[in-house]
């Protein structure tokens, strides 16, 4: 049984979150949680929270055994970018893009 959890509009770029997602794809959830706990990146904390949510969803909604679960799929899509302005010299301004991403984790007992 596949169970999904999503974090939409996560305040990290998709490029940075994908580096973390690649670390846990296909692993058992217990191993994935350990990896994320000791990964020193901001995106690791965000991905860990989504993974914990997926595990809780599987246990509560589908009655799955946590020991059998593995990360079947994990992907990170780009969300909308927030446009901001940074003042520069001589009255100019630069545009800053604050990027967001959508993190999706699918856990399965198969």
Curated annotation (Swiss-Prot):
Record's subunit section:
Part of the 50S ribosomal subunit.
Upper lineage: Bacteria, Pseudomonadati, Pseudomonadota, Gammaproteobacteria, Pasteurellales
Provenance organism? Glaesserella parasuis serovar 5 (strain SH0165) (Haemophilus parasuis)
- Any one cellular-component term (Gene Ontology): cytosolic large ribosomal subunit
Any one GO molecular-function label of the UniProt entry:
rRNA binding
> What keywords were assigned to this record?
Ribonucleoprotein, Ribosomal protein, RNA-binding, rRNA-binding
Supply the Gene3D superfamilies for this chain: Ribosomal protein L22/L17
Q: What does this protein do?
A: This protein binds specifically to 23S rRNA; its binding is stimulated by other ribosomal proteins, e.g. L4, L17, and L20. It is important during the early stages of 50S assembly. It makes multiple contacts with different domains of the 23S rRNA in the assembled 50S subunit and ribosome.
> What's this protein's name?
Large ribosomal subunit protein uL22
């Amino acid at each position: 049984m596949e169970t999904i959890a999503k974090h939409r509009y996560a305040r990290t770029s998709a490029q940075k979150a994908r580096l973390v997602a690649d670390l846990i794809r296909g692993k058992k959830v217990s191993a994935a949680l350990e990896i994320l706990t000791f990964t020193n990146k901001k995106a690791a904390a965000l991905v860990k929270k989504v993974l914990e949510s997926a595990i809780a969803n599987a246990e509560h909604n589908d009655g799955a055994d946590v020991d059998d679960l593995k990360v079947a799929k994990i992907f990170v899509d780009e969300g909308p970018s927030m446009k901001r302005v940074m003042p520069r010299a001589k009255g100019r301004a630069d545009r800053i893009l604050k990027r967001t991403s959508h993190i999706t984790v699918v856990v399965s007992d198969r």
